């Protein structure tokens, strides 16, 4: 079908498992960033507000005002939508925040690789039939992160809240046979930190308290260069000077002291077996994806490793990854890891760049195409 023109700026939505990033193509950074959470009241009546209808829900900034009386749920689990009603509520809130008519703006939506085809078809159905979007395009976050770094070839390690991917990209196209996926990411680190804190006597039970643990994770956790050495420093009989144990003040004013939990929690990215998962570590997946790529591309990929996603932001993450990959890679191979400072939003930024290009108009799936060919049309235009 011939290319189409749209008078209104495309909307870019990075549909993360933990955080939604949304705004208009050409913007930098995204204009709206909020937790991908839906809160339902745990009680029927709270102060002067009568909440008796189960359809009552809270999304985005409204959650902060009522957090203590809400049961919080993520619509997505490991990159896959698990509750479509809640996902629709999050997208409706997104449009409300953007203050636009959905029928007037094409949408670029991120979707992680190797997700079920039915997942993408259901999303397309919602955008075309519920929101009446004029056009839609799905793109892989890792590819967009690469664009944001100014490259079209490289290998991206993208670790967000729900899932971690290693995606080799050549000239803007992901190499599907070499993609690696690990269902361990930020939310798993939060849950393991919650477990470790419980063992230390700090009990965080509710879904709202779990959000407090997530914030503790983001503010205090780090990746140890040598976990064994860190453990030895914390041993009671260690002769070495012990590191200062940082403290964290909880919303209720209580103070907790954090020790080995700070590096033990993120360690599951490198050693999933700590939590009983049989997946390979991220460094092993990265090396495996490179080795699955064509022989003449491997050298390029080793020297163009790009980090993306919020779970790569831990202090020490890049140095540790480099050290681990060096142990696995061929000798004398040049290894370079690039960690863009804005990588928490790099997928959105890449989408903003892509949707702004004049040539991108050829890639949209229009509502007319959807109505003529059905859901299958969306699988023809994705990379």
Curated annotation (Swiss-Prot):
SUPFAM superfamilies: Actin-like ATPase domain. GO terms for molecular function: ATP binding; polyphosphate kinase activity. Belongs to the actin family. ARP1 subfamily. GO terms for cellular component: centrosome; cytoplasm; dynactin complex. This is Centractin. It comes from Dictyostelium discoideum (Social amoeba). Keywords: ATP-binding, Cytoplasm, Cytoskeleton, Nucleotide-binding. It is found in: Cytoplasm, Cytoskeleton; Cytoplasm, Cytoskeleton, Microtubule organizing center, Centrosome. Its main location: cytoplasm. The gene is arpA.
């Amino acid at each position: 079908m011939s290319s189409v023109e749209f008078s209104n700026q495309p909307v870019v939505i990075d549909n993360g498992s933990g955080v939604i990033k949304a705004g208009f193509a050409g913007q930098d950074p995204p204009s709206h960033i909020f937790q991908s959470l839906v809160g339902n009241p745990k009680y029927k009546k709270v102060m002067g507000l009568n909440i008796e209808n189960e359809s009552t829900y809270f999304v985005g900034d409204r959650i902060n005002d009522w957090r203590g009386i809400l049961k919080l749920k993520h619509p997505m689990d490991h990159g896959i939508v698990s509750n479509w009603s809640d996902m629709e509520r999050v997208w409706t809130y997104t449009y409300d925040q953007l203050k636009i008519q959905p029928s007037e703006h094409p949408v670029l939506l991120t979707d992680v690789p190797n997700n079920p085809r039915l997942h993408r078809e259901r999303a397309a159905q919602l955008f075309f039939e519920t929101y009446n979007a004029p056009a839609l395009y799905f793109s892989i976050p890792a590819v967009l992160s690469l664009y944001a770094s100014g490259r079209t070839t490289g290998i991206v390690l993208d670790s967000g809240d729900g899932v971690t991917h290693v995606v080799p990209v050549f000239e803007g196209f992901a190499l599907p046979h070499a993609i690696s996926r690990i269902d361990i990411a930020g939310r798993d680190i939060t849950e393991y930190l919650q477990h470790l804190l419980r063992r230390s006597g700090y009990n965080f039970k509710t879904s709202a308290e779990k959000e407090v643990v997530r914030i503790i994770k983001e503010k205090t956790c780090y990746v140890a260069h040598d976990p064994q050495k860190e453990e030895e420093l914390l041993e009671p009989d260690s002769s070495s000077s012990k590191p200062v144990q940082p403290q964290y003040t909880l919303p209720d004013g209580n103070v907790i002291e954090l020790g080995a939990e700070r590096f033990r929690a993120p360690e599951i990215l490198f050693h999933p077996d700590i939590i009983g998962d049989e997946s390979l570590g991220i460094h092993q997946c990265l090396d495996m994806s490179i080795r699955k790529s064509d022989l003449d591309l491997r050298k390029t990929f080793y020297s163009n490793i790009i980090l993306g996603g919020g779970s790569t932001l831990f202090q020490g993450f890049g140095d540790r990854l480099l050290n681990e990959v060096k142990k696995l890679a061929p000798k004398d191979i040049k290894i370079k890891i690039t960690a863009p400072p804005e990588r928490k939003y790099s997928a959105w930024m890449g989408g903003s760049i892509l949707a702004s290009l004049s040539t991108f108009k050829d890639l949209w799936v229009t509502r007319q195409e959807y109505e003529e060919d059905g859901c299958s049309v969306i699988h023809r235009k994705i990379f």
